[in-house]
Structure formats: structure tokens, C-alpha cells
């Protein structure tokens, strides 16, 4: 069957749930003992159907139980909304197999690796009024953990709905969408959490709220590009899309038509957004992503966006200053992702390439080759900047003179992945 570095990867999200049951089904035709099947099982509905269809006798697996050790009990009790399902981020595999690290991080289970250190939700010795600012995975996990420990939690979100960056990553991954649904359900069910939507938190907001503790999870600052044309009307960024999903028209959008469309799109999505709808619109609409795209930034965000562009038939160029496109993609996913780019007729990768200017016709750049630097012009109707995030300590520092306990978590403290944010939110709430 191979491993991650084969033409068909074994356990990544590129493989559908239950895909490998055809192997166990064939083994059952000759086996005299019960057959267990253990790869790519994350959805209990698929597992149950495969058992009923006789494709296996026993569901084996690890990642679904890493994500939620109580999953079998929840299945028996039909607690569908409380199932914390694996998002197939492969962080567990990357840490243990690729890097030889302990099994301490999971994209959705903040307690992983700390089971013997303390109770899951140690009861607080003193009930506190806790202000959580930001509702991404760090903020929501902090809010849920603090509430479980007995604190009174106020969860603030500047946009019209909870979810933070997961609202956008859900467009690329249905697995993230179901995790977002889980988080929203848990917040809604908890009586100790009061949600404040469409509320921008400032130092004055904190002063008036008078919390005993503040957990700041407002996300990082998007990294920009300082070259001529970076503010052109054909330029978009991942932050622009997050702003639009939050119902805010991104700043600096030039051109009457362009400005109108961003404003109208922001207004519409503030009322009717769902990840599935946004995914469909991204696939079919020529705006704001045209059929010819240059992506500046070949890290994980750029690669995921590039994969979406590739699958939707867009001519796609991925430009990266480092030696390799996908330099920070996990070991489990990297080979299959880069192989799909190499095999696609509509994708070109430009490593060791520095952008010098952006025009309405495309991107000017300089690529380092063994023969020396070579000037390039990469045609594109849309230029997407996906350079990642920088830390964002402004609000956290402003809160310190106002609140006895202040914790910065998630990308605003240290930009990272969903597993890092999940763990940081949990640990901060346990420290209250």
C-alpha cells in the first residue's frame, strides 16, 4: 500500500475516509479470523456503514482516538454533536514519525500528552471573571476550558460569527468545517460562556468589563510585500478574505468596480456565509480570483490555496523565495502535495524567486539558478499574497496595566498551526 512518499499517500486528507477498506474486504475472503482495518477512519458514520457492508469485522485506528478518546462511548450514546473528529492534519504523525518528537500535539485535542500531569479540567480554587478576546481555535479552546473549570467567561469576537481563521480554512477543508461546527456547538451548549459578537475590544472595553483575567487570542498581523504594485487592484491577500468573511470591506481596494464588489461581498457574507457556500463560489466565480493566478508565498497557506486553484482549473503559479515550495508543509503531506503540483498541467512552481514588482499583467521577479540570477515575468490576472503572519502583541500589552492576569495565545503570541493554537488556549485557561 505504500507510505506518504508514494504516488497514492496512505493516511493524508487526499485519501477519503474508508478508502482502504477494499483491502480488508479482499483479505476477508480468505481469512479465518476477524479482520481489522485501521487506516483513514475518522467519520463514525463511514465506519459503521463499512461494518454493515461487511468490508471489515473490526474498526481499528489511532488518530480518531487521539482526537477524541471518548469517541466510541459517544457513538454508543448517539452524541453526534459532541464528537470531536480528527481533521487529518497529520500533526501527530509528523511529530512522531518525521521528527521523532513525543506525541503531545493534536489539531483538535488540547489535552493530548498531558493526561498524567493533571485532570482534564482541574476545578479552579477561585471563580474568576475571564475575558477571552478572539474566537479562533486558541480563543474558543481557552473559553471552553475556563468554563469547564468553573470560571465565568465572556468571549468576544469582532466579526459576526465565531471561528477565527478556521472560518477561512474550512473553505479549503471539509474536515475543518466539521471541527468548526463542533466548536460552535460546545460554546452554545455551555451556560458559563457569554458570547459578544460584532464587538471590537479596545483597552477601554477591557477597562469597563473589569475582568479578573484576560486571554488575548486576536490572531497575528498579516505579512505584506513591499514592492511596487503590491497595492494594485488585482492584488488580494488571505487577510482580505478573512476580513470579507467577517463582514468587513478590506482596506485599500482600488478601482470603482473592485471596491464595489469587495463591499458587496463583505455585506453578503456577513449575513449568509457558510464554508460550503464560500467553497462553491470560489470554485465557480471569476471574482475575486480570476482564471490566471500568481501566488506569492509558497508555504502552507500558499500551497493550500494553490491546490484549490489547481483543482478548479485555474492557471496557477506559486512563487517562493526559499529553496523549496512547501518548505513548512508537514512531512506526511509534502510529497503528495508537491507531486500533484508537478503533475498538473496548470501549475508552475518558482522556488528561489524574489518578487520585484507587480503589474496589472502579472509579476516581475528574479530567480536564482545555477547559472546566476534570471529575470522573469509571470503573467497573472490575480496576484495573491500568502506570506503568513507575524506576532501581534499590541492588545495584550495594552491589557497588562488593566488586568491582573493576561495571557497571549495563538498566532498573536507565536504564529503557528492549529495544533499549537489549540494547546496554547487550553494551557492558558488551565493556568488561571
Locate each region found by the language model.
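Flavin-dependent oxidoreductase catalytic cores
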Residues: 1-133, 137, 141-153, 161, ...
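Residues at the starts of beta-strands that form the adenosine-phosphate
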Residues: 34, 129, 152-154, 292, ...
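Internal hydrophobic alpha-helix adjacent to the cofactor/substrate pocket in enzyme cavities
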Residues: 68, 73-74, 306-314, 318-319, ...
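Glycine/Thr-rich phosphate-binding loops of Rossmann-like dinucleotide-binding domains
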Residues: 69, 96, 116, 223-225, ...
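Beta1/beta-strand and adjacent pyrophosphate-binding region of the FAD-binding site
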Residues: 126-136, 286-299
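Glycine-rich FAD pyrophosphate-binding loop
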Residues: 151-164, 314-326
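A Rossmann-like FAD-binding core segment of flavoenzymes
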Residues: 177-224, 232, 240, 256-259, ...
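A conserved FAD-binding loop/helix module that cradles the flavin
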Residues: 301-308, 329-330, 400, 409-432
Amino acid at each position: 500500500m505504500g507510505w506518504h512518499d508514494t504516488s497514492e499517500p496512505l493516511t493524508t486528507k487526499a485519501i477519503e475516509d474508508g478508502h482502504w477498506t477494499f483491502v480488508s474486504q479482499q483479505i476477508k475472503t480468505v481469512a479465518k479470523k476477524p479482520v481489522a482495518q485501521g487506516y483513514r477512519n475518522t467519520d463514525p458514520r463511514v465506519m459503521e456503514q463499512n461494518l454493515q457492508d461487511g468490508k471489515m469485522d473490526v474498526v481499528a485506528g489511532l488518530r480518531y482516538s487521539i482526537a477524541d478518546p471518548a469517541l466510541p462511548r459517544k457513538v454508543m450514546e448517539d452524541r453526534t454533536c459532541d464528537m470531536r473528529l480528527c481533521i487529518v492534519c497529520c500533526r501527530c504523525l509528523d511529530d512522531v514519525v518525521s521528527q521523532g518528537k513525543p506525541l503531545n500535539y493534536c489539531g483538535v485535542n488540547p489535552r493530548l500528552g498531558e493526561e498524567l500531569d493533571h485532570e482534564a479540567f482541574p476545578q479552579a480554587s477561585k471563580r474568576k471573571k475571564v475575558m477571552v478576546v478572539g474566537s479562533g481555535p486558541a480563543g474558543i479552546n481557552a473559553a471552553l476550558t475556563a468554563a469547564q473549570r468553573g470560571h465565568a467567561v465572556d468571549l468576544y469576537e469582532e466579526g459576526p460569527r465565531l471561528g477565527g481563521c478556521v472560518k477561512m480554512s474550512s473553505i479549503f477543508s471539509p474536515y475543518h468545517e466539521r471541527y468548526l461546527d463542533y466548536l460552535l456547538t460546545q460554546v452554545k451548549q455551555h451556560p458559563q460562556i457569554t458570547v459578544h459578537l460584532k464587538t471590537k475590544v479596545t483597552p477601554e472595553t477591557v477597562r469597563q468589563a473589569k475582568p479578573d483575567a484576560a486571554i488575548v487570542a486576536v490572531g497575528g498581523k498579516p505579512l505584506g510585500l513591499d514592492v511596487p504594485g503590491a497595492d494594485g487592484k488585482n492584488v488580494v491577500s488571505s487577510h482580505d478574505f478573512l476580513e470579507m468573511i467577517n463582514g468587513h470591506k478590506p482596506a485599500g481596494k482600488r478601482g470603482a468596480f473592485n471596491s464595489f464588489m469587495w463591499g458587496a461581498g463583505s455585506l453578503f457574507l456577513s449575513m449568509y456565509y457558510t464554508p460550503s457556500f464560500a467553497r462553491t463560489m470560489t470554485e465557480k466565480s471569476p471574482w475575486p480570483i480570476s482564471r490566471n493566478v500568481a501566488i506569492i508565498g509558497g508555504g502552507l497557506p500558499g500551497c493550500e490555496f494553490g491546490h484549490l486553484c489547481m483543482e478548479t482549473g485555474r492557471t496557477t503559479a506559486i512563487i517562493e523565495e526559499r529553496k523549496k515550495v512547501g518548505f513548512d508543509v508537514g512531512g506526511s503531506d509534502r510529497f503528495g502535495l508537491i507531486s500533484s503540483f508537478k503533475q498538473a498541467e496548470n501549475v508552475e512552481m518558482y522556488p528561489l524567486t524574489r518578487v520585484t514588482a507587480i503589474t496589472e499583467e502579472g509579476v516581475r521577479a528574479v530567480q536564482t539558478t545555477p547559472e546566476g540570477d534570471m529575470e522573469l515575468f509571470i503573467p497573472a490576472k490575480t496576484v495573491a499574497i500568502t506570506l503568513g503572519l507575524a506576532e501581534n502583541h499590541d492588545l495584550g500589552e495594552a491589557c497588562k496595566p488593566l488586568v491582573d492576569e493576561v495571557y497571549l495565545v495563538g498566532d498573536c503570541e507565536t504564529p503557528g498551526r492549529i495544533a499549537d493554537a489549540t494547546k496554547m488556549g487550553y494551557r492558558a485557561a488551565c493556568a488561571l
